[in-house]
UniProtKB/Swiss-Prot annotation:
Signal peptide: 1-34
Sugar-bearing residue positions: N48, N162, N182, N285, N295, N341, N603, N745, N998, N1046
Listed GO CC annotations: apical plasma membrane; endosome; lateral plasma membrane; plasma membrane
Deleted gene: phenotype: Adults display a slight decrease in olfactory avoidance behavior towards the repellent odorant benzaldehyde. Also, the ellipsoid body in the brains of many mutants are decreased in size. No visible effects on development and mutants are viable. RNAi-mediated knockdown in the neurons of adult males significantly reduces survival to 37 percent. Adult survival begins to decrease from approximately day 9 post eclosion. Pan-neuronal or glutamatergic neuron-specific RNAi-mediated knockdown decreases adult climbing behavior.
Name this protein carries in UniProt: Semaphorin 5c
C-alpha cells in the first residue's frame, strides 16, 4: 500500500506539498471502471440549477412539527402496525401520526436533585437534562426507552399505545451519559440488547456490550482500557445479519501509532451466541470480537482516503452496506459515499490477522487455525487465548467498485437514509445524504451487470436559517417520506417533487425514479397504483443521470410570505407584497419560461378623501332661530390599511334668515304620578295583632305647570303578627303581716296572716291584666314578740325552754331556745362595742353566717336622656340588717341612650297625634338650622307608633253596655275586701325597732294552707329601715277605721284609704319567682306555674 509518510520534524515545511497533492487527486481525470461507466464527481450547484429545490419550495409539500417547550428531536421509532412514530426529545416522548400530528405527549424529565448532582459534577445546565437516546419496540405492545437523565442514565418500559410507564430500569451500559455521545444499540426479539457506547461519566470507557433489557442480567463487553480492542471509538451505527451483529465506528488506529495519530473507519463483528470466556481469561469479555478497516478512497499512485465514517444504512434485502465518509480534519474537506457487499466484509474477517506482540514491536500478519469461535462455533481455552491475541484483521474491507459511488470536494457528508424503488422497468436504490449547509442530496444508484451508476437527482435546502443541527434522519417506505430530527423541530419531506416539472420532456429528462408522465392528465406524477392507469404513465426506458443539456421549461416557485413593500413615488404609503421566481426549475437551454405574474400586491395604504357636499337641508323649524345643514363623507376614497383619515368637518351649518318669530308656547301641564311603593316597616307588635306601614312619593312624574296631584294616599297600612300572645303570669309582693285574732295588743299572743296575688296578661295592654285568687300564710305570735308559723309538734304540751345566754356582750349576738323538735333564735346585745370596726370572730357576722339577700329591685331609669349614664338597683338582707349578709346592697350599671348629637339643631317633639283609623299615631319635629352640618339635624323628622286597636270604641262600649255589671262587681269586691281588712287589722302593725330586731324565725315552718316546698319570703319581718320601694300598707293611725273593716281594696290603691296595693312589690320580693326553702342561695325561680294555687 502506497502511503505518503510525513516525518514530524518536516511536517510544517512540507505542508504545502500535501495540499497540492490533495488538489491534484480531487480535480484530476477519473479512471474508468471495468463496466464502462465513469463515476460522476460533484459539481458546484448554484440556485439556478434545475435540480435545486429551495427551502421555500420544499416546505410547500413538507410538514414541520415545532414545540416551543421541546428541543433535541434525536430519536425516532416507526410503528407501522399502529401507523405512528415514537419521537424522543429532551425531557419528552411524543406519539405522532406519520403526518406528524401529535397523538400524545409524555413528560420525562430528570428530578431537581439529579440535576443539582449533575451540575455539581461539573456539567453545564444545558446538558443536565434527560435526553432520550434509545427507543426500541419489544414484543407486541412494549416500548423500551432510555435517556441520559442528567448523566444518570435511566430506562423505562412503556405501552406503545399510550406511553404509560409500566416499569423502570437502570440505563447504565445501555444508554450514553452525554447527550452528544455517538452511540448505537440494537434489540433482538429475545430481549438481548447489543450496545456500542461510552459506559462511564467521563466517556473514556468505550465498549461494545451485550446485555438483557431486564435487570441484573450478565453482560459481555470488549476488554476494558485496551486500545487493541477499542481506542476511543465513536459509533455510527449497527445492524444484524445471520449469526452476527456488526458495528460501524471510527477510532484511533493503534497500528499507526508509531507514525502519529490517525482516525480509521472500522467494522466490528461479534457473534450473537457468544457466551464469553471463563476463569481469568476473557471473563465477561467477547471471544468472537473482530474488527477490520473500511476502505473508501480515490485510487491513484497516492490514494486519497476518506477515513472518518459519518453515517450508514443497510439494505437487508440486497445485503449491501452504504456509508458516508469524510476526510480527516487536517486535510481539505472532502466527502464520499461507498457501498460494501456483506460478502466482502465477511471475507475480510476470514483473512489473516494483524498483531503486535509488544508495544515496541512492529505489526505483522498472522494466520491461525483456531478460528471457530469467530464463526460462532464452540470454543475452548485455546480459542480464548487466540481471541485475546487477535482482534484486528490484516486486510481492509473493499467497497463495491474501484472508487466511491459519489464524492464531492469542500463538502462534509453526514447521516444517510435509503429507499429501494421499483420503476417501470428496473430497480433503483435512492440515497438521501445529509450535506453541509443543511442540504440533502438525493442520489440514484443503479446496479447492473456492467457496474454501478450513481447520479445526483435533486438537491434540497432543508433549512434556511443555517443554525439547526441534524440529529437523526430516517426514511419510511409507508409514507414515502424522509424524516429529519433536528435540535429545533421535526420535519417530514416527501421523497418526490414531480409537480415541479411542467412538461413531459422536463419530467422524463429529470430521471427521477419516483416520477413519470401521466398522459391522461398531462402532468408529471408519481407512479399510480391502479394498473389501468399505469399503462398511460410513462418513464424513460432506462433511468440514467438527469439530462442537463436538454431544454428545460421553467416552473414557478412557491409564493413568498407576505411582506411590507413601498408604493412607487409615495414614501408614506405601503403595501403587502409577495413574490415568486421562475426557478423551480429555471428555464434552461431554450426551455419555455413561466407564464403569469411574479409579484402580487394587496392591502396598499389608502388615504381618505372627501366626497362632494350634499344639498342644504330644510331649516330645522319654520319660525324663530333655525339652522340648515349639509354633509359630506370621507369615502372618496375611504381610508384603509393605515391610511390617513380626511381632515376637516363632515358637516356644515348655516342660520336660516328672515324667519318670523315663534309665538310663546304655554308650558304644558304635567299631572303627577305615584312612584313605586317603598318597603314595609317593621310590625308594631310581635303578637296579638300589630300594624306596619309603607309609603310612596308623587314623583313619577312630579306635577308640573299646574298639573294634578297624585290621587290616593301617600301611606298604606296593613295588619301583621295577628297570632295570639302567650299568657304571662307574675306574682305580687307579699302583703305585710296582718293581725287576724287577738285584742290587737302585740304583747299578747295573736295570729297574723299575709297575702299575695297572681296577675295574668296576654298583651301589653293594661286592660288585659287579670287578678287571680290570693294565696295566704299564717303565723302565731307570742307575748315575747317571737312569731312562729303553725306546725304540729310531737310534744305540744312541753313548755318552751329558757333562752340561752347571748353569744356576745355587744355588737349583736344570738340567743336560742328549743321546744320539742323545734327551735327559735333571736338577736341580742345589739348595742355597739367600743371598737365596732374590729369585730371578733364571735361577732354577729360570724354567728349569722347564713344571712341571705333578698331579690334585686328593678333597674332604675337611666340617669341621662342621651349619651352614657348610670342606672341602679338595690336589695335588702333577709336577716334584718345589711351587715348580716355578704355582698353589696347597691349595684350600678352603665346605660347608653341615643347619641346626644341627634338632638342638635332639632326643635322639641310635638305632641302625639290622635290615633288614625289604621291605629297609627305620629309626632314630628323640625330642623332649626337652614343649612345643617354633619352633626346637626341627624335622625328622622317624623316618628310613628301603633295605637291599641279600637281602644276608643271598646272603651265607649264598655262604658255604656256593661256599666251595670261593672258597678255590681265593684260593690261585691269592696264588701269582700272590707271583711278581710277587718280581720287583718285587729293588731297593731308596727313594732319598735328593738322588738323588730329581736324577732326571730323558727327553723321549722308550717302553713295553714297546703304543703309547698317553696316559700316566697322568710318568716321574719324587719321594720328598722324602710326600703325605697315601700309596701302599699302604711302604719294605721289610731283614728283609722282600717281595723273596723272600712278599708277598700281597689285597683288604683288609693293611699288615703290605708289599703294595700295588691300588685306592689316589697324590697324582699321577687318579680316573678319564689325562693326555695332548702336552697343555700335562695335562688329566684321564674316559673310561677310551680306555685300550686
Amino acid at each position: 500500500m502506497n502511503m505518503l509518510i510525513l516525518k514530524l520534524p518536516k511536517m510544517f515545511s512540507q505542508l504545502w506539498l500535501l495540499l497540492i497533492l490533495s488538489l491534484l487527486t480531487l480535480e484530476g481525470p477519473q479512471p474508468s471502471t471495468g463496466s464502462g461507466y465513469t463515476t460522476k464527481s460533484s459539481v458546484d450547484l448554484l440556485e439556478n440549477d434545475s435540480r435545486y429545490i429551495s427551502y421555500q419550495d420544499l416546505m410547500s409539500t413538507a410538514k414541520r412539527f415545532y414545540d416551543p417547550e421541546t428541543t433535541w428531536y434525536s430519536e425516532m421509532l416507526f410503528d407501522v402496525a399502529r401507523n405512528q412514530v415514537i419521537v424522543g426529545a429532551r425531557d419528552t416522548l411524543y406519539r405522532m401520526s406519520f403526518d406528524l400530528e401529535p397523538l400524545e405527549r409524555a413528560s420525562w424529565g430528570a428530578t431537581p436533585s439529579e440535576i443539582a448532582m449533575c451540575q455539581a459534577k461539573g456539567q453545564s445546565e444545558r446538558w443536565c437534562r434527560n435526553y432520550v437516546r434509545v427507543l426500541h419496540s419489544y414484543g407486541e405492545n412494549q416500548l423500551y426507552a432510555c435517556g441520559t437523565n442528567a448523566f444518570q442514565p435511566s430506562c423505562s418500559w412503556r405501552q406503545m399505545e399510550n406511553l404509560t410507564v409500566t416499569g423502570v430500569d437502570s440505563g447504565v451500559v445501555k444508554c450514553p451519559f452525554h447527550p452528544q455521545a455517538n452511540s448505537t444499540s440494537l434489540l433482538q426479539s429475545n430481549g438481548q440488547l447489543f450496545v456500542g457506547t461510552a459506559t462511564d461519566f467521563s466517556g473514556s470507557d468505550v465498549a461494545i456490550l451485550r446485555t438483557g433489557v431486564e435487570s441484573n442480567k450478565r453482560f459481555l463487553r470488549t476488554k476494558q482500557y485496551n486500545n487493541n480492542w477499542l481506542s476511543g471509538a465513536q459509533f455510527v451505527g449497527s445492524f444484524e445479519a445471520g449469526h452476527f451483529v456488526y458495528f460501524l465506528l471510527r477510532e484511533s488506529a493503534a497500528e499507526h501509532m508509531s507514525c502519529g495519530k490517525v482516525i480509521y473507519s472500522r467494522v466490528a463483528r461479534v457473534c450473537k451466541n457468544d457466551v464469553g470466556g471463563g476463569g481469568q481469561l476473557l471473563r465477561d469479555n467477547w471471544t468472537s470480537f473482530l474488527k477490520a478497516r473500511l476502505n473508501c478512497s480515490l485510487p491513484g499512485e497516492y490514494p486519497y482516503y476518506f477515513d472518518e465514517i459519518q453515517g450508514m444504512t443497510y439494505a437487508e434485502s440486497e445485503s449491501i452496506l452504504y456509508a458516508t465518509f469524510r476526510t480527516s480534519g487536517s486535510s481539505i474537506f472532502g466527502s464520499a459515499v461507498c457501498a460494501y457487499n456483506l460478502s466482502s466484509i465477511n471475507a475480510a474477517f476470514d483473512g489473516p490477522f494483524k498483531q503486535q506482540e509488544h508495544s515496541d514491536a512492529a505489526w505483522k500478519t498472522v494466520n491461525t487455525n483456531q478460528r471457530s469461535q469467530f464463526q460462532c462455533g464452540t470454543s475452548s481455552i485455546g480459542h480464548w487465548l487466540e481471541s485475546s491475541r487477535y482482534q484486528l484483521m490484516d486486510e481492509a474491507v473493499q467497497p463495491i467498485g474501484a472508487e466511491p459511488l459519489y464524492h464531492s470536494k469542500l463538502e462534509q457528508f453526514g447521516r444517510l437514509a435509503l429507499d429501494i424503488i421499483n420503476t417501470k422497468t428496473e430497480q433503483v436504490h435512492v440515497l438521501f445524504v445529509a450535506s453541509s449547509g443543511n442540504h440533502i442530496k438525493k442520489l440514484s444508484v443503479k446496479y447492473d451487470g456492467d457496474g454501478v451508476q450513481t447520479c445526483l437527482v435533486e438537491l434540497w435546502q432543508a433549512d434556511d436559517t443555517g443554525t439547526s443541527s441534524l440529529l437523526n434522519m430516517a426514511y419510511l417506505k409507508v409514507s414515502d417520506s424522509l424524516y429529519l430530527g433536528t435540535d429545533l423541530a421535526l420535519t417530514r419531506i416527501p421523497a418526490q417533487h414531480c409537480s415541479r416539472h411542467v412538461s413531459q420532456s422536463s419530467c422524463l429528462n429529470s430521471m427521477d425514479p419516483y416520477c413519470g408522465w401521466n398522459e391522461l392528465v398531462e402532468r408529471c406524477m408519481p407512479q399510480p397504483q391502479d394498473s389501468s392507469v399505469l399503462q398511460h404513465w410513462h418513464q424513460a426506458p432506462q433511468i440514467t443521470c438527469p439530462v442537463l443539456n436538454a431544454p428545460i421549461d421553467g416552473g414557478w416557485s412557491t409564493w413568498s410570505p407576505w411582506a411590507v413593500c413601498q408604493q412607487h413615488e409615495q414614501p408614506d404609503s405601503n403595501c403587502q407584497c409577495r413574490q415568486r421566481s421562475c426557478n423551480n426549475p429555471q428555464p434552461q437551454h431554450g426551455g419555455a419560461t413561466c407564464e403569469g405574474i411574479s409579484t402580487q400586491v394587496t392591502n396598499c395604504t389608502q388615504h381618505g378623501g372627501w366626497t362632494e357636499w350634499s344639498a342644504w337641508s330644510p331649516c330645522s323649524q319654520t319660525c324663530g332661530i333655525a339652522v340648515k345643514i349639509r354633509r359630506r363623507t370621507c369615502g372618496n376614497p375611504r381610508p384603509a390599511f393605515g391610511g390617513r383619515t380626511c381632515v376637516g368637518s363632515e358637516q356644515s351649518e348655516m342660520y336660516c334668515r328672515h324667519l318670523p318669530p315663534c309665538p310663546v308656547a304655554k308650558p304644558q301641564s304635567v299631572d303627577g304620578g305615584w312612584g313605586p311603593w317603598g318597603e314595609w316597616s317593621e310590625c308594631s307588635a310581635q303578637c296579638g295583632g300589630g300594624f306596619r306601614m309603607r309609603r310612596r312619593e308623587c314623583n313619577d312624574p312630579a306635577p308640573l305647570n299646574g298639573g294634578m296631584e297624585c290621587p290616593g294616599c301617600r301611606l298604606d297600612y296593613e295588619e301583621c303578627n295577628m297570632q295570639s300572645c302567650q299568657e304571662v303570669r307574675k306574682l305580687s309582693a307579699w302583703t305585710p303581716w296582718l293581725t287576724v285574732t287577738g285584742s290587737g295588743n302585740s304583747s299578747e299572743p295573736h295570729m297574723e296572716r299575709r297575702f299575695r296575688f297572681v296577675c295574668r296578661a296576654t298583651s301589653p295592654d293594661p286592660s288585659s291584666v287579670r287578678i287571680g285568687l290570693p294565696k295566704e300564710e299564717s303565723r302565731n305570735c307570742h307575748a315575747d314578740g317571737s312569731c312562729q308559723r303553725q306546725v304540729d309538734h310531737d310534744s305540744a304540751d312541753s313548755d318552751a325552754a329558757d333562752w340561752s345566754p347571748c353569744s356576745v356582750s355587744c355588737g349583736g349576738g344570738v340567743q336560742q331556745r328549743h321546744r320539742g323538735r323545734g327551735s327559735q333564735s333571736r338577736v341580742c346585745n345589739i348595742h355597739a362595742c367600743p371598737a365596732e370596726e374590729q369585730l371578733s370572730s364571735n361577732s354577729l357576722d360570724n354567728e349569722l353566717e347564713h344571712g341571705e339577700w333578698g331579690c334585686w329591685s328593678e333597674w332604675s331609669a337611666c340617669s341621662v336622656t342621651c349619651g352614657l349614664g348610670l342606672r341602679r338597683r338595690t336589695r335588702r338582707c333577709l336577716a334584718g340588717h345589711d351587715r348580716l349578709c355578704q355582698g353589696r346592697a347597691l349595684e350600678e350599671q352603665k346605660c347608653e341612650m341615643v347619641p346626644c348629637e341627634d338632638f342638635l339643631g332639632w326643635s322639641a317633639w310635638s305632641e302625639w297625634s290622635s290615633c288614625s283609623s289604621d291605629g297609627i299615631r305620629l309626632r314630628h319635629r323640625r330642623c332649626l338650622v337652614e343649612q345643617p352640618g354633619s352633626m346637626e339635624c341627624r335622625g328622622a323628622e317624623f316618628e310613628k307608633t301603633a295605637c291599641v286597636p279600637n281602644e276608643c270604641e271598646e272603651t265607649q262600649t264598655a262604658s255604656t253596655a256593661t256599666l251595670p255589671i261593672v258597678i255590681f262587681v265593684g260593690l261585691l269586691f269592696t264588701v269582700a275586701c272590707c271583711l278581710a281588712t277587718y280581720r287583718f287589722t285587729k293588731k297593731r302593725f308596727m313594732l319598735s325597732a328593738e322588738e323588730a330586731l329581736n324577732k326571730t324565725t323558727t327553723t321549722t315552718a308550717s302553713f295553714d294552707t297546703y304543703p309547698n316546698q317553696y316559700s316566697s319570703l322568710p318568716t321574719k319581718d324587719y321594720y328598722d329601715q324602710r326600703p325605697k320601694r315601700q309596701s302599699s300598707f302604711r302604719m294605721p293611725a289610731k283614728t283609722s277605721n282600717l281595723g273596723n273593716g272600712n278599708g277598700t281594696l281597689n285597683r288604683n290603691n288609693m293611699h288615703q284609704n290605708n289599703t294595700p296595693k295588691v300588685l306592689a312589690k316589697t324590697y324582699i320580693d321577687c318579680e316573678s319567682g319564689t325562693i326555695k326553702r332548702q336552697s343555700a342561695l335562695n335562688n329566684c325561680r321564674s316559673n310561677i306555674d310551680d306555685e300550686k294555687f
